[in-house]
């Protein structure tokens, strides 16, 4: 089909292989691409400007919510653009170092418990 490709994900548990794949793809494509690693096995390739941050801001615009009024929760490198784009970036306790570096709040819990903690604290005020 004549449909544009927006995202490609490769999976390999070996970080050195993932770095090699990233380097080879970025060397061979003739357009701007963002590449991120996530979940200790994925290499994600998106067109520049196609990321969770842009999607979050677009949804906010659609709903009439300003970026500084948005809370985003993340845990991995592919969440960094989203975390950078919002007013309250939150990560769970087992988040990657780069995600944590872009957070204003690090939840004490992992995954679901961390998300519940953030919602209780910042949305419900408990």
Walk through the language-model features, giving the residues of each.
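Conserved acidic, metal-coordinating active-site core of Asp-based
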Residues: 1-73
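Mg2+-dependent phosphoryl-transfer enzymes with acidic/Ser/Thr/Gly-rich catalytic loops
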Residues: 44-126
């Amino acid at each position: 089909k004549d449909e544009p490709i927006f995202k490609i994900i490769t999976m390999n548990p070996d970080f050195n292989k993932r770095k090699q794949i990233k380097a080879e793809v970025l060397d061979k494509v003739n357009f701007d691409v963002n590449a991120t690693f996530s979940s200790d096995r994925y290499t994600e390739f998106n067109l520049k400007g196609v990321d969770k941050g842009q999607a979050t801001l677009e949804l906010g615009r659609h709903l009439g919510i300003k970026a500084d009024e948005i809370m985003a929760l993340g845990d991995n490198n592919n969440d960094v653009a989203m975390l950078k784009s919002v007013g309250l970036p939150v990560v769970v306790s087992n988040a990657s170092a780069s995600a944590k570096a872009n957070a204003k709040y690090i939840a004490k819990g992992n995954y679901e418990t961390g998300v519940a903690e953030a919602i209780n604290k910042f949305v419900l005020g408990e």
